[in-house]
Amino acid sequence: IMKLEEIIDISKTVGNSLFKDITYIWEVLPKIEDNIIDIGNSLDKDKYTMIEENIWVGNNTKIDKLSTIIAPCIIGENTEIRPGAYLRGNVIIGDNCVIGNSVEVKNSIIFDNSQIPHFNYVGDSILGYHSHLGAGVILSNLKNDESNIVIKGIDTNMIKLGSIIGNNVNIGSNSVLYPGTIIGCNTSIYPL
C-alpha cells in the first residue's frame, strides 16, 4: 500500500487535520462526519461565510441556484458549483474547484484545483490536488454483494468506500472505478 505522502499533499485541503493519526488513507473518510463542523467553525471568517447552518463557502465562489447542498459542507474559495450539482453532506471541497452539471458528491474530500465537471458520481472518496474526472466517470463505492471492501488483502471494515485519487490525476470519460481503487500521482486513465 502506498504511503500517504506518495498519493496526496495534505497541505492542499482545509481538511488536513483529518489525516492525523491514521494508518491507512481510507481511515479519513469515517472521520469526516465527526469533524467537519469543528473544521468549519475554525475557518478564517475573512475567507469563509456560513451561508446556512453548517454550510461554509469561500470567497468568490459561485453556486448555481439549481444546485443542492446538504449540510454539513465546506466549499473553498474561487470554486464553481454548477447547475444540478448535488452535494449530499459531509463534503469538503477545496479552492479553485469545479463541481459540474449532474455531479453527485457525498462523504468525500476534494482537494484544491480539482475538477468534477459533468455527470459524475463521487461517493466516499478522496480526490487529490489538481485531479480531473472526465464526463461520466463514476467512483463506485459499494460492491454488489455489499461486503467489506478489501484493498491488497487488508479488510477496510467499510462497506462503502469509493476511490483514493492522487495528485495530478486525469481519469478519462466514462471510466468506472471499482470500490476501493487507489490511483497514484501523475496518472492518466484513457477514456473508454
Where do the PLM segments sit?
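Terminal amphipathic alpha-helical/low-complexity segments used for targeting or macromolecular assembly
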Residues: 1-54, 181, 185-186, 192
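Structural signal for interior beta-strand "rungs" in well-ordered beta-sheet cores
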Residues: 45, 49-146, 150-191
